[in-house]
A protein has these predicted regions:
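Basic, Lys/Arg-rich alpha-helical nucleic-acid-recognition elements, primarily the DNA-binding modules
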Residues: 1-2
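Extended, helix-rich structural scaffolds rather than catalytic motifs
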Residues: 5-181
Length: 181
């Protein structure tokens, strides 16, 4: 195996880590970035954005990257559904995005609490550093930009309040879909 890896110039990180992509917008939104980074840290992955292709990439061990992608898709669809249910159509896009950002902030807090309760939490920091180093080797230097989000009090606080109602214990079944539990 070592000879084949040397012959084809493959590193061990390329064999251990995989990436999962999610279709995203080319324009960066604060709530999606916050949600992706939080979910990625829970599943020991690195969340990257490919602006040219409009993709969100979760990079880590194959199962962890898959779980991060699925959780991100579930939570982002849930947030969009909550916006349609709870916010009137005539409200502005800024108001809706602040509501989404409020939900994402509350979910980030809840996911961080959930991450502290897992049995492998002490080892997570070392794994995150290894994944980050492998992602930099794979994709190049990773730049993090500051997201500007002016808070509109009413929309943000409504989002934070409604973010507590989102279920984080969704279970996949063998049937044609998912059950919320």
């Amino acid at each position: 195996a070592q000879k084949l890896m040397e012959a084809y110039h493959i590193t061990e990180a390329e064999c251990v880590y995989a990436s999962q992509t999610v279709k995203a917008t080319k324009r960066e939104s604060a709530w999606r970035t916050m949600l992706a980074n939080t979910v990625a840290s829970l599943y020991v992955c690195e969340a990257l954005r490919d602006v040219l292709r409009g993709q969100m990439i979760f990079y880590g061990e194959p199962f962890d990257a898959f779980m991060a992608k699925e959780m991100y898709c579930y939570l982002s669809k849930t947030i969009d559904r909550m916006v349609k249910q709870n916010i009137r159509k005539r409200n502005t896009l800024k108001y809706k995005n602040q509501y989404r950002f409020g939900i994402a902030c509350r979910l980030a807090f809840r996911i961080d609490e959930l991450g502290q309760q897992v049995s492998w939490a002490p080892e997570r920091e070392h794994k995150l550093l290894a994944v980050k180093k492998a992602a930099e080797n794979e994709f190049g230097i990773i730049m993090r930009g500051e997201l500007k989000t002016p808070l509109r009090d009413k929309a943000f606080t409504r989002g934070v309040a409604d973010g507590g109602t989102v279920s984080l214990h969704r279970q996949a079944t063998a049937r044609n879909g998912y059950l919320e539990g």
